[in-house]
From Swiss-Prot:
Similarity section: Belongs to the FAD-dependent oxidoreductase family.
InterPro entries xref list: FAD-bd_OxRdtase (IPR050260), FAD/NAD-bd_sf (IPR036188), FAD/NAD-binding_dom (IPR023753), NO_rdtase_NorW (IPR023961), Rbx-bd (IPR041364)
Organism: Salmonella paratyphi C (strain RKS4594)
Main location: cytoplasm
Gene name of this polypeptide: norW
Keyword annotations from UniProtKB, A to Z: Cytoplasm, FAD, Flavoprotein, NAD, Oxidoreductase
Lineage: Bacteria, Pseudomonadati, Pseudomonadota, Gammaproteobacteria, Enterobacterales
Name listed for the protein in its UniProt record: Nitric oxide reductase FlRd-NAD(+) reductase
Amino acid sequence: MSRGIIIIGSGFAARQLVKNIRKQDAHVPLTLIAADSMDEYNKPDLSHVISQSQRADDLTRQLAGEFAEQFNLRLFPHTWVADIDADAHVVKSQDKQWQYDKLVLATGAAALVPPIAGRELMLTLNSQQEYRACEIPLRDAQRVLIVGGGLIGSELAMDFCRAGKTVTLMDNAASLLASLMPPEVSSRLQHHLTDMGVHLLLKSQLQKLEKTEAGIRATLVSQHSIEVDAVIAATGLRPETALARRAGVVVNRGVCVDSYLQTSHPDIYAIGDCAEINGQVLPFLQPIQLSAMYLAKNLLGGNAPLKLPAMLVKVKTPELPLHLAGETQRRDLSWQITAESDGMIAKGMSGEGQLRAFVVSEDRMKEAFALLKTLSV
């Protein structure tokens, strides 16, 4: 008798995998176990909740029970998995255990919080649950410090500014989106945020946070300090690998998987923000959607290696939206930038004259798909 497939996690990756499995097999036993409520919400919406005056509960799209009924699943919400016995094919919580034929880790990633004095005063916005815990102080805060000038930090800075709050955006780097693109490309967004009223503290490092009568005092390594009402950590994500380690599978930055999404144990797989696919962590929606399609086939007896095409990453900054693709972080590319009032096209060219990366903004985003076709991957 088939013991079926167990998926640990309930986020976008887990749900996409369930849908793809059920397209091919309506009856294989499917069990989902997760520490949260398992209600569905759209995680990218977290970048816009403040300007749109949304409460955490407004983000819910489908209740867990409806999802279970629609896709013929067993769900175990609010359940912490304590251990995995890979040899016995058993998943254990404090008071239950489940046997499986195939196990999928879809445990996601946790928000990184800088290890500074007063770090407990920092808020994170990496899940509906985290937003629910801090929505009142964030709604009431007038002065907000966002630590981290990457994708999420830039999106949140624009959103909080659009909501009428006084926003300071801090980063160690000399420019925004520094891990994604060179400053000559990100400068358009940087200037726009400044024009909106966002105060940028670049080449700056936070030293400590202290509670005061007036709110929170943030002190920089330079000893400069600012008073704010709320501090948000947007310094990146750390793949959740603790369960994989307990199961004895190989872990690096994320849970190491091959092109079949298979870990070092033949019956354990990983997908989504927790997975490191052939050395790459890809915490974006499109790679997860494609991973779910291929993994569903492989869990049901197929042997299909994941093939990822050139893909767009969208920066959700509505007043100056950006699309990027390719190896935008490469430092050896020569950038050809055309900037006009209706938008920007920046092309990253290799020494051989090949298009290796591009960034487009505003009305020039309509040219992204044509550029994708000419991108060398």
